[in-house]
A protein has these predicted regions:
Chain A
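Low-complexity, intrinsically disordered terminal/linker segments enriched in charged
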Residues: 156-196
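Positively charged n-region of N-terminal signal peptides that target proteins for export
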Residues: 1-5
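Short beta-strand edge/turn micro-motifs at domain boundaries
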Residues: 137-166
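Surface-exposed, charged secondary-structure patches
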Residues: 96-138, 189, 193-196
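Solvent-exposed loop/turn segments at secondary-structure junctions
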Residues: 75, 92-93, 131-132, 160-164
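Early exported N-terminus immediately downstream of N-terminal targeting peptides
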Residues: 24-102
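Boundary at the C-terminal end of the N-terminal hydrophobic targeting segment
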Residues: 20-22
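Bacterial N-terminal signal peptides
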Residues: 7-17
Length: 196, 262
Protein backbone atom coordinates (compact mmCIF):
# COMPACT_ATOMS: atom_id res chain seq x y z
CA UNK A 1 0.00 0.00 0.00
CA UNK A 2 2.78 2.33 1.05
CA UNK A 3 4.76 1.31 -2.01
CA UNK A 4 1.80 1.99 -4.35
CA UNK A 5 1.33 5.39 -2.82
CA UNK A 6 5.00 6.15 -3.34
CA UNK A 7 4.86 5.11 -7.03
CA UNK A 8 1.70 7.16 -7.55
CA UNK A 9 3.26 10.29 -6.04
CA UNK A 10 6.42 9.70 -8.02
CA UNK A 11 4.45 9.42 -11.28
CA UNK A 12 2.53 12.62 -10.60
CA UNK A 13 5.74 14.38 -9.72
CA UNK A 14 7.41 13.10 -12.89
CA UNK A 15 4.51 14.11 -15.13
CA UNK A 16 4.51 17.63 -13.65
CA UNK A 17 8.28 17.78 -14.04
CA UNK A 18 8.15 16.55 -17.66
CA UNK A 19 5.35 18.98 -18.58
CA UNK A 20 7.23 21.81 -16.98
CA UNK A 21 10.08 21.28 -19.39
CA UNK A 22 8.16 20.46 -22.57
CA UNK A 23 7.64 23.34 -24.99
CA UNK A 24 4.37 23.76 -26.83
CA UNK A 25 5.04 24.04 -30.60
CA UNK A 26 3.16 27.33 -31.00
CA UNK A 27 5.12 28.89 -28.12
CA UNK A 28 8.32 27.55 -29.65
CA UNK A 29 7.47 29.18 -33.01
CA UNK A 30 6.43 32.49 -31.46
CA UNK A 31 9.58 32.68 -29.36
CA UNK A 32 11.75 31.79 -32.39
CA UNK A 33 10.02 34.47 -34.43
CA UNK A 34 10.42 37.00 -31.63
CA UNK A 35 14.12 36.23 -31.37
CA UNK A 36 14.58 36.70 -35.13
CA UNK A 37 12.48 39.89 -35.16
CA UNK A 38 14.56 41.33 -32.34
CA UNK A 39 17.76 40.71 -34.31
CA UNK A 40 16.28 42.18 -37.49
CA UNK A 41 15.08 45.33 -35.77
CA UNK A 42 18.44 46.00 -34.11
CA UNK A 43 20.75 48.66 -35.43
CA UNK A 44 23.38 46.23 -36.68
CA UNK A 45 25.23 45.67 -39.93
CA UNK A 46 23.76 43.07 -42.26
CA UNK A 47 26.71 40.76 -41.59
CA UNK A 48 26.19 40.94 -37.82
CA UNK A 49 22.48 40.24 -38.25
CA UNK A 50 23.29 37.23 -40.44
CA UNK A 51 25.65 35.85 -37.78
CA UNK A 52 22.97 36.16 -35.09
CA UNK A 53 20.30 34.62 -37.33
CA UNK A 54 22.60 31.68 -38.01
CA UNK A 55 22.80 30.96 -34.27
CA UNK A 56 18.99 30.99 -34.01
CA UNK A 57 18.69 28.66 -37.01
CA UNK A 58 21.22 26.21 -35.59
CA UNK A 59 19.23 25.99 -32.36
CA UNK A 60 15.76 25.71 -33.83
CA UNK A 61 15.98 23.96 -37.22
CA UNK A 62 16.70 20.29 -37.85
CA UNK A 63 19.35 21.18 -40.44
CA UNK A 64 20.90 17.71 -40.68
CA UNK A 65 17.50 16.06 -41.08
CA UNK A 66 16.33 18.54 -43.73
CA UNK A 67 19.63 18.03 -45.55
CA UNK A 68 19.18 14.28 -45.86
CA UNK A 69 15.47 14.63 -46.60
CA UNK A 70 16.12 17.03 -49.48
CA UNK A 71 18.73 14.70 -50.92
CA UNK A 72 15.91 12.26 -51.70
CA UNK A 73 16.75 8.79 -52.98
CA UNK A 74 20.38 9.79 -53.64
CA UNK A 75 21.18 9.56 -49.91
CA UNK A 76 20.88 5.76 -50.11
CA UNK A 77 23.93 5.58 -52.38
CA UNK A 78 26.20 7.67 -50.17
CA UNK A 79 29.04 6.09 -48.23
CA UNK A 80 29.90 7.32 -44.73
CA UNK A 81 32.61 9.72 -45.94
CA UNK A 82 30.25 11.32 -48.47
CA UNK A 83 27.48 11.52 -45.88
CA UNK A 84 29.76 13.42 -43.53
CA UNK A 85 30.91 15.71 -46.33
CA UNK A 86 27.35 16.34 -47.47
CA UNK A 87 26.09 17.09 -43.93
CA UNK A 88 28.87 19.67 -43.51
CA UNK A 89 28.32 21.29 -46.91
CA UNK A 90 24.56 21.35 -46.52
CA UNK A 91 24.78 23.00 -43.11
CA UNK A 92 26.97 25.78 -44.52
CA UNK A 93 24.69 26.23 -47.52
CA UNK A 94 21.51 26.18 -45.44
CA UNK A 95 22.71 28.69 -42.87
CA UNK A 96 23.89 31.10 -45.54
CA UNK A 97 20.75 30.78 -47.64
CA UNK A 98 18.35 30.90 -44.67
CA UNK A 99 19.96 33.83 -42.88
CA UNK A 100 20.49 35.97 -45.98
CA UNK A 101 16.86 35.42 -46.99
CA UNK A 102 15.70 36.54 -43.57
CA UNK A 103 18.13 39.45 -43.34
CA UNK A 104 16.25 41.16 -46.18
CA UNK A 105 13.31 41.79 -43.87
CA UNK A 106 13.31 44.65 -41.43
CA UNK A 107 11.24 44.10 -38.33
CA UNK A 108 8.80 41.51 -39.72
CA UNK A 109 5.65 41.05 -37.66
CA UNK A 110 4.50 37.45 -37.45
CA UNK A 111 1.42 36.38 -35.50
CA UNK A 112 1.05 32.75 -34.49
CA UNK A 113 -2.62 31.91 -34.89
CA UNK A 114 -3.35 28.23 -34.63
CA UNK A 115 -1.91 24.75 -34.50
CA UNK A 116 -2.86 21.31 -35.78
CA UNK A 117 -1.38 18.20 -34.23
CA UNK A 118 -0.76 15.78 -37.11
CA UNK A 119 0.56 12.94 -34.95
CA UNK A 120 2.87 12.55 -31.96
CA UNK A 121 5.85 13.50 -34.11
CA UNK A 122 4.47 16.50 -36.00
CA UNK A 123 2.46 19.64 -35.33
CA UNK A 124 1.68 22.29 -37.91
CA UNK A 125 1.71 25.80 -36.48
CA UNK A 126 -0.14 28.41 -38.53
CA UNK A 127 1.06 31.99 -38.59
CA UNK A 128 0.70 35.17 -40.61
CA UNK A 129 3.36 37.61 -41.75
CA UNK A 130 1.57 40.94 -41.52
CA UNK A 131 0.93 43.05 -44.60
CA UNK A 132 3.17 46.04 -45.30
CA UNK A 133 3.16 48.73 -47.99
CA UNK A 134 5.49 46.59 -50.04
CA UNK A 135 3.84 43.18 -49.86
CA UNK A 136 0.51 41.59 -49.02
CA UNK A 137 -0.16 39.43 -45.94
CA UNK A 138 1.61 36.07 -46.18
CA UNK A 139 0.51 32.82 -44.52
CA UNK A 140 3.36 30.80 -43.09
CA UNK A 141 2.89 27.30 -41.67
CA UNK A 142 5.62 25.68 -39.66
CA UNK A 143 6.06 21.93 -39.62
CA UNK A 144 7.41 21.20 -36.17
CA UNK A 145 9.00 17.91 -35.18
CA UNK A 146 7.78 17.18 -31.68
CA UNK A 147 9.13 13.72 -30.95
CA UNK A 148 11.24 15.24 -28.20
CA UNK A 149 8.78 17.71 -26.62
CA UNK A 150 11.60 19.39 -24.72
CA UNK A 151 13.42 20.19 -27.92
CA UNK A 152 11.01 20.82 -30.80
CA UNK A 153 12.61 21.46 -34.18
CA UNK A 154 11.50 23.13 -37.42
CA UNK A 155 11.46 20.70 -40.33
CA UNK A 156 9.69 22.75 -42.98
CA UNK A 157 8.22 26.15 -43.72
CA UNK A 158 5.11 26.20 -45.87
CA UNK A 159 4.63 29.67 -47.33
CA UNK A 160 1.17 30.22 -48.84
CA UNK A 161 0.91 26.45 -49.23
CA UNK A 162 4.32 26.07 -50.87
CA UNK A 163 6.76 23.86 -49.03
CA UNK A 164 10.36 25.04 -48.89
CA UNK A 165 11.70 21.56 -48.10
CA UNK A 166 9.88 20.13 -51.10
CA UNK A 167 11.16 22.92 -53.36
CA UNK A 168 14.68 22.31 -52.11
CA UNK A 169 14.34 18.56 -52.69
CA UNK A 170 13.21 19.11 -56.28
CA UNK A 171 16.02 21.61 -56.84
CA UNK A 172 18.64 19.11 -55.66
CA UNK A 173 17.05 16.35 -57.76
CA UNK A 174 17.29 18.61 -60.81
CA UNK A 175 21.00 19.31 -60.20
CA UNK A 176 21.69 15.61 -59.82
CA UNK A 177 19.70 14.63 -62.88
CA UNK A 178 21.44 17.28 -65.03
CA UNK A 179 24.76 15.73 -63.99
CA UNK A 180 23.91 12.04 -64.42
CA UNK A 181 23.33 11.59 -60.69
CA UNK A 182 26.92 12.53 -59.81
CA UNK A 183 26.89 13.55 -56.13
CA UNK A 184 30.17 15.45 -56.58
CA UNK A 185 28.39 17.93 -58.86
CA UNK A 186 25.98 18.72 -56.02
CA UNK A 187 28.89 19.03 -53.59
CA UNK A 188 30.56 21.48 -55.94
CA UNK A 189 27.38 23.54 -56.37
CA UNK A 190 26.92 23.72 -52.59
CA UNK A 191 30.57 24.68 -52.12
CA UNK A 192 30.36 27.44 -54.73
CA UNK A 193 27.21 28.86 -53.18
CA UNK A 194 28.76 29.02 -49.73
CA UNK A 195 31.96 30.64 -51.06
CA UNK A 196 30.24 33.42 -52.99
CA UNK B 1 -13.38 25.88 -86.95
CA UNK B 2 -14.03 27.53 -83.57
CA UNK B 3 -17.29 25.64 -83.22
CA UNK B 4 -15.46 22.39 -83.86
CA UNK B 5 -12.86 23.20 -81.25
CA UNK B 6 -15.49 24.04 -78.64
CA UNK B 7 -17.35 20.80 -79.44
CA UNK B 8 -14.13 18.80 -79.02
CA UNK B 9 -13.42 20.50 -75.69
CA UNK B 10 -16.90 19.85 -74.35
CA UNK B 11 -16.91 16.25 -75.61
CA UNK B 12 -13.58 15.65 -73.91
CA UNK B 13 -14.88 17.20 -70.73
CA UNK B 14 -18.08 15.19 -70.84
CA UNK B 15 -16.20 11.94 -71.51
CA UNK B 16 -13.66 12.56 -68.83
CA UNK B 17 -16.27 13.49 -66.27
CA UNK B 18 -18.08 10.23 -66.99
CA UNK B 19 -14.92 8.18 -66.88
CA UNK B 20 -13.91 9.69 -63.59
CA UNK B 21 -17.34 9.82 -62.08
CA UNK B 22 -15.86 8.31 -58.96
CA UNK B 23 -12.96 10.75 -58.89
CA UNK B 24 -12.15 12.09 -55.50
CA UNK B 25 -9.67 14.64 -54.24
CA UNK B 26 -7.02 11.96 -53.80
CA UNK B 27 -6.95 11.01 -57.47
CA UNK B 28 -6.76 14.66 -58.53
CA UNK B 29 -4.06 15.21 -55.93
CA UNK B 30 -2.06 12.27 -57.28
CA UNK B 31 -2.41 13.33 -60.91
CA UNK B 32 -1.20 16.84 -60.11
CA UNK B 33 1.60 15.87 -57.77
CA UNK B 34 4.59 17.95 -58.87
CA UNK B 35 6.97 14.98 -58.79
CA UNK B 36 4.67 13.08 -61.19
CA UNK B 37 4.70 15.82 -63.83
CA UNK B 38 7.36 15.26 -66.47
CA UNK B 39 9.59 17.93 -67.91
CA UNK B 40 9.48 16.39 -71.39
CA UNK B 41 11.52 19.05 -73.18
CA UNK B 42 13.71 20.38 -70.42
CA UNK B 43 16.42 21.79 -72.70
CA UNK B 44 13.90 23.80 -74.67
CA UNK B 45 12.14 24.88 -71.46
CA UNK B 46 15.40 26.03 -69.91
CA UNK B 47 16.16 28.07 -73.05
CA UNK B 48 12.71 29.69 -72.91
CA UNK B 49 13.18 30.31 -69.19
CA UNK B 50 16.50 32.06 -69.89
CA UNK B 51 14.80 34.17 -72.57
CA UNK B 52 12.05 35.12 -70.11
CA UNK B 53 14.65 36.12 -67.54
CA UNK B 54 16.28 38.47 -70.05
CA UNK B 55 12.86 39.89 -70.88
CA UNK B 56 12.10 40.30 -67.18
CA UNK B 57 15.39 42.11 -66.58
CA UNK B 58 14.85 44.40 -69.56
CA UNK B 59 11.16 45.20 -69.17
CA UNK B 60 9.15 43.77 -66.27
CA UNK B 61 11.65 44.30 -63.46
CA UNK B 62 12.39 47.98 -64.26
CA UNK B 63 8.70 48.75 -64.78
CA UNK B 64 7.77 46.91 -61.56
CA UNK B 65 10.45 48.90 -59.71
CA UNK B 66 8.82 52.17 -60.77
CA UNK B 67 5.32 50.77 -60.16
CA UNK B 68 6.29 49.87 -56.57
CA UNK B 69 7.05 53.53 -55.93
CA UNK B 70 3.46 54.55 -56.67
CA UNK B 71 1.30 55.30 -53.60
CA UNK B 72 -0.07 52.15 -52.00
CA UNK B 73 -3.81 53.05 -52.52
CA UNK B 74 -3.15 53.54 -56.23
CA UNK B 75 -1.47 50.15 -56.53
CA UNK B 76 -4.22 48.38 -54.64
CA UNK B 77 -6.79 50.09 -56.89
CA UNK B 78 -5.01 48.74 -59.97
CA UNK B 79 -4.72 45.28 -58.40
CA UNK B 80 -8.43 45.32 -57.48
CA UNK B 81 -9.57 46.30 -60.97
CA UNK B 82 -7.43 43.53 -62.53
CA UNK B 83 -8.92 41.01 -60.11
CA UNK B 84 -12.38 42.31 -60.93
CA UNK B 85 -11.84 41.74 -64.66
CA UNK B 86 -10.59 38.22 -64.00
CA UNK B 87 -14.06 37.42 -62.62
CA UNK B 88 -15.12 37.11 -66.26
CA UNK B 89 -12.99 33.97 -66.49
CA UNK B 90 -13.54 32.83 -62.90
CA UNK B 91 -17.36 32.77 -62.97
CA UNK B 92 -17.75 30.39 -65.96
CA UNK B 93 -15.13 28.17 -64.36
CA UNK B 94 -16.96 28.16 -61.02
CA UNK B 95 -19.93 26.84 -62.99
CA UNK B 96 -17.84 24.30 -64.93
CA UNK B 97 -16.54 23.00 -61.61
CA UNK B 98 -20.08 22.73 -60.25
CA UNK B 99 -19.46 25.41 -57.65
CA UNK B 100 -22.66 27.37 -58.23
CA UNK B 101 -22.59 29.10 -54.85
CA UNK B 102 -19.15 30.55 -55.60
CA UNK B 103 -20.37 31.55 -59.09
CA UNK B 104 -23.21 33.49 -57.43
CA UNK B 105 -20.91 35.19 -54.95
CA UNK B 106 -18.42 36.13 -57.68
CA UNK B 107 -21.20 37.49 -59.88
CA UNK B 108 -22.28 39.63 -56.94
CA UNK B 109 -18.68 40.76 -56.50
CA UNK B 110 -18.39 41.64 -60.19
CA UNK B 111 -21.61 43.66 -60.25
CA UNK B 112 -20.94 45.51 -56.99
CA UNK B 113 -17.29 46.26 -57.67
CA UNK B 114 -17.85 47.33 -61.27
CA UNK B 115 -20.64 49.73 -60.31
CA UNK B 116 -20.28 50.93 -56.72
CA UNK B 117 -16.58 50.14 -56.73
CA UNK B 118 -16.01 52.25 -59.90
CA UNK B 119 -14.76 49.71 -62.47
CA UNK B 120 -13.38 47.50 -59.74
CA UNK B 121 -10.97 50.04 -58.27
CA UNK B 122 -12.53 49.57 -54.82
CA UNK B 123 -13.28 46.12 -53.44
CA UNK B 124 -16.68 47.10 -52.01
CA UNK B 125 -17.83 43.47 -52.03
CA UNK B 126 -15.13 42.48 -49.55
CA UNK B 127 -16.22 45.27 -47.23
CA UNK B 128 -19.81 44.08 -47.49
CA UNK B 129 -18.73 40.64 -46.30
CA UNK B 130 -18.67 38.66 -49.54
CA UNK B 131 -16.18 35.78 -49.53
CA UNK B 132 -12.53 36.37 -50.33
CA UNK B 133 -11.95 36.21 -54.07
CA UNK B 134 -10.15 33.21 -55.56
CA UNK B 135 -9.31 33.06 -59.25
CA UNK B 136 -10.30 30.04 -61.32
CA UNK B 137 -9.32 29.22 -64.89
CA UNK B 138 -10.02 26.64 -67.59
CA UNK B 139 -6.88 24.66 -66.71
CA UNK B 140 -8.25 24.21 -63.18
CA UNK B 141 -11.66 23.17 -64.53
CA UNK B 142 -10.06 20.59 -66.84
CA UNK B 143 -8.13 19.23 -63.85
CA UNK B 144 -11.30 19.03 -61.72
CA UNK B 145 -12.82 16.90 -64.48
CA UNK B 146 -9.94 14.48 -64.28
CA UNK B 147 -7.73 15.68 -67.13
CA UNK B 148 -4.08 15.20 -66.25
CA UNK B 149 -1.55 18.02 -66.59
CA UNK B 150 0.59 16.52 -69.34
CA UNK B 151 4.17 17.74 -69.55
CA UNK B 152 5.55 20.82 -67.83
CA UNK B 153 6.30 23.61 -70.30
CA UNK B 154 7.68 27.12 -70.13
CA UNK B 155 5.94 29.56 -72.45
CA UNK B 156 7.69 32.61 -73.89
CA UNK B 157 6.67 35.74 -71.94
CA UNK B 158 3.89 33.91 -70.03
CA UNK B 159 6.19 31.61 -68.07
CA UNK B 160 5.59 28.23 -66.42
CA UNK B 161 2.63 26.10 -67.48
CA UNK B 162 1.58 22.56 -68.37
CA UNK B 163 0.05 21.24 -71.59
CA UNK B 164 -3.38 21.18 -69.94
CA UNK B 165 -3.07 24.70 -68.55
CA UNK B 166 -1.87 26.00 -71.93
CA UNK B 167 -4.93 24.51 -73.63
CA UNK B 168 -6.94 26.17 -70.85
CA UNK B 169 -5.41 29.52 -71.80
CA UNK B 170 -6.24 28.92 -75.47
CA UNK B 171 -9.91 28.59 -74.46
CA UNK B 172 -9.72 32.22 -73.29
CA UNK B 173 -9.03 33.28 -76.87
CA UNK B 174 -11.70 31.07 -78.37
CA UNK B 175 -14.73 32.45 -76.63
CA UNK B 176 -13.99 31.59 -72.99
CA UNK B 177 -13.04 35.08 -71.85
CA UNK B 178 -15.80 37.68 -72.10
CA UNK B 179 -13.23 40.50 -71.69
CA UNK B 180 -11.33 39.23 -74.73
CA UNK B 181 -14.59 38.87 -76.65
CA UNK B 182 -15.65 42.47 -76.13
CA UNK B 183 -12.23 44.02 -76.65
CA UNK B 184 -10.37 42.05 -79.30
CA UNK B 185 -12.72 39.58 -80.92
CA UNK B 186 -15.76 41.76 -81.47
CA UNK B 187 -15.73 45.31 -82.63
CA UNK B 188 -17.62 47.14 -79.89
CA UNK B 189 -17.83 50.90 -79.70
CA UNK B 190 -16.72 51.03 -76.09
CA UNK B 191 -13.56 48.96 -75.97
CA UNK B 192 -10.65 48.23 -78.25
CA UNK B 193 -7.77 45.77 -78.45
CA UNK B 194 -5.52 48.12 -76.55
CA UNK B 195 -7.75 47.80 -73.48
CA UNK B 196 -7.27 44.04 -73.45
CA UNK B 197 -3.52 44.01 -74.01
CA UNK B 198 -2.84 46.85 -71.58
CA UNK B 199 -4.86 45.04 -68.90
CA UNK B 200 -2.75 41.92 -69.44
CA UNK B 201 0.54 43.83 -69.29
CA UNK B 202 -0.61 45.69 -66.17
CA UNK B 203 -1.57 42.37 -64.61
CA UNK B 204 1.96 41.06 -65.29
CA UNK B 205 3.58 44.17 -63.83
CA UNK B 206 1.29 44.06 -60.77
CA UNK B 207 2.20 40.40 -60.16
CA UNK B 208 5.91 41.15 -60.56
CA UNK B 209 5.69 44.11 -58.16
CA UNK B 210 3.73 42.17 -55.52
CA UNK B 211 6.29 39.39 -55.57
CA UNK B 212 9.31 41.59 -56.19
CA UNK B 213 11.34 40.73 -53.08
CA UNK B 214 10.28 37.08 -53.08
CA UNK B 215 11.46 36.62 -56.69
CA UNK B 216 14.73 38.47 -56.11
CA UNK B 217 15.34 36.48 -52.94
CA UNK B 218 14.57 33.18 -54.60
CA UNK B 219 16.83 33.92 -57.54
CA UNK B 220 19.69 35.00 -55.29
CA UNK B 221 19.45 31.99 -53.00
CA UNK B 222 18.61 29.23 -55.47
CA UNK B 223 21.12 26.68 -56.63
CA UNK B 224 18.97 26.01 -59.69
CA UNK B 225 16.48 28.85 -60.18
CA UNK B 226 14.70 27.04 -63.03
CA UNK B 227 14.02 24.00 -60.81
CA UNK B 228 12.84 26.17 -57.92
CA UNK B 229 10.36 28.08 -60.08
CA UNK B 230 9.09 24.83 -61.60
CA UNK B 231 8.56 23.26 -58.18
CA UNK B 232 6.79 26.33 -56.78
CA UNK B 233 4.56 26.69 -59.84
CA UNK B 234 3.47 23.04 -59.76
CA UNK B 235 2.83 23.10 -55.99
CA UNK B 236 0.77 26.26 -56.41
CA UNK B 237 -1.30 24.73 -59.22
CA UNK B 238 -1.93 21.61 -57.15
CA UNK B 239 -3.31 23.78 -54.35
CA UNK B 240 -5.45 25.88 -56.67
CA UNK B 241 -6.91 22.84 -58.43
CA UNK B 242 -7.95 21.32 -55.12
CA UNK B 243 -9.30 24.68 -53.95
CA UNK B 244 -7.87 24.03 -50.56
CA UNK B 245 -6.05 26.07 -48.04
CA UNK B 246 -5.26 22.95 -46.10
CA UNK B 247 -1.71 21.79 -46.09
CA UNK B 248 -1.38 19.11 -48.70
CA UNK B 249 1.08 16.35 -47.87
CA UNK B 250 4.31 18.27 -47.87
CA UNK B 251 6.72 15.63 -46.77
CA UNK B 252 6.88 11.88 -47.05
CA UNK B 253 7.20 10.65 -43.47
CA UNK B 254 8.72 7.34 -44.56
CA UNK B 255 11.74 9.33 -45.73
CA UNK B 256 12.11 10.78 -42.26
CA UNK B 257 11.73 7.41 -40.57
CA UNK B 258 14.57 6.12 -42.71
CA UNK B 259 16.74 9.14 -41.85
CA UNK B 260 16.00 8.87 -38.13
CA UNK B 261 16.69 5.15 -37.96
CA UNK B 262 20.21 5.55 -39.33
Amino acid sequence: MKYNKFVFILLIYLSIFMNAYSIEPEIFVQSTVNRASKVLSQDLTKEKKIEKLKIIAEETVDIRGIGFYTLGGARKNLNDVDKKKYAKLFKKYFLKSFSSRLAEYTNPEIDVQNKKILNENYTIVNSVLKETNERPEIKIDWRIYTKNPKNPLIRDLIIEGLSLARTQKEEFASILSSNNGDINSLFKTLENFSKN
Amino acid sequence: MLKRFVIIIFTTLALSSNVVAGTDGELILKKNKPSEIKDCSEKFNRATFAFNQVLDGAIFKPVATVYRKLPSPLRSGVGNSIDNLSNLITIPNNILQGDFAKAGVNTGRLVLNTTVGIFGIFDVAQQLGLDEYEKEDFGQSFARHGIGPGCYIVLPVLGPSTVRDTIGSVVNFTGGDAWYNITVKNDTQYFSEIDYYSSKVTSGVDFRAKNFNAIENLEKNSLDFYASVKSLYLQDRQQKILNTKKIIETQDDSDWEEIENK
